[in-house]
Amino acid sequence: MEYRNVSRFSRRKFLFAGFVAAAGRPTTYAQQPAPIPETLTQWLAASAKMRELALQRCLNRIQTMEPSIHAWVQVSPQKNATRGRLSGIPYGVKDIIETRGLATEYGSPIYKGRIGTTDAAIIREMRKHGAILLGKTQTTAFAYLTPAPTRNPRDLDRTPGGSSSGSAAAVAAGMVPFAIGEQTRGSVLRPASFCGVTGFKPTYGLLSMEGVLPLSKSLDTLGFFTHTPADMSALWDSLGHSVGSSEDFDLGAPEPIPDVEPTMAAAYKNALSHLRNAGASIRPIDIAGKLAKLAEANLTVMLYEGSRFHKQRYDQYGNRLADLADLVRRGLQISADFYEEALRYIDSCRVQFAEQFKRTPVILTPAALGPAPAGLASTGDPRMNAPWTALGTPAASIPMPVGTALPLGLQLTAERGGEARVLRTAVRLQNMLGSQPI
């Protein structure tokens, strides 16, 4: 069906509902002896033949749905004969990441038609494990504010978030089982929350940023999108990182959270109550003030470093850089002393949170202020994610079960180096939350 032949309301509902129906449809051996995989966990368990069929279905979905969602800059499947755990499994990658022979346009019309001449380190890593690069996903311009044309598969009249807009939308729409993004403030965790998928960013510096367009050298971190926490855990394991087994410990959660919208406040409160009733030990912690100041420090660092990195580009293109031009002008007004003060505050908070993580090894917060904003003019507010990006801690956003309502994410973070703990806990909490609306 061509989406231009159905009503906007019907089209908006069909895009996501059709994928969910396919993913959750009960089957019998008489009906379908070998179901075509949907989630990454299913892909990993599938035969090579079933992976081929699933890849073709991904391409068919892109052909059908892309005119409405605009998740991609370019779709051009790259051959990969390497045998690995991800062999034959497709993925998308944010268009600030260099890819040899494919468009690398940074989300800006200035670089329209630019073709990458080298592969970023993360692309080489994926190739080593056998994954198939399907193409480049949309990003806000230079991974900053100017929105991409991407629409949220859960509601086409809303943003998918940013700056990793296309990667989140592509996974949410079932176009790929996983995708790569990048976060400087909240560019992975917030889109994951808005699109109802799982987002994850590891500890700052753990994954090489070689070949990724910088915005802030002290903050930029690669991240991933999958359908479920179990998929994310499987992806991390497939890349050679041990996840280990589940463990019991106290969780920390600030209650209430200032500034969140009523829908998020209610969902967050209900999620904590549901988890406590299911046996989780959750201790209230008083960190809201520190989180707000950390978000401000994150912004200061990003503006200062981003303005200096992009100064030469600004001198050449000026206001053609759109919102990035404003970043350069604002950032150049920040003194070195003020920048250093922000870095010192972040360092002091790392020490304080290291002690907090000894008491509550995983901290829970909302993954966004609320659901995805209406329209495409704004990709949403990153203040719930920016503190953890500043601290460089691993963090994940998992979907809270909210039924047919707009998606909302629950955010988890742990001490630096605690990727396995975050992922194990994410899987455990998702299982405890279940699928019934909270």
Features from the language model and the residues they span:
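N-terminal secretory signal peptides
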Residues: 1-9, 13
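Short, well-ordered alpha-helical
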Residues: 18-23, 29-115, 142-144, 261, ...
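Gly/Ser-rich, acidic/histidine-flanked active-site/gating loops
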Residues: 33-37, 42-44, 97-100, 221, ...
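Acyltransferase
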Residues: 53-55, 264-285, 311-316, 339-360
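Conserved hydrophobic/aromatic pocket- or pore-lining residues that grip, position, or stack substrates
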Residues: 58, 94, 126, 275, ...
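Short helix-loop capping/hinge segments that flank enzyme active sites or metal/cofactor-binding pockets
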Residues: 86-106, 300-354, 399-409
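Glycine-rich, small-residue loops and helix-cap segments
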Residues: 88, 128, 132, 226, ...
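Short glycine/serine-rich loop segments
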Residues: 118-236, 394-402, 406-411
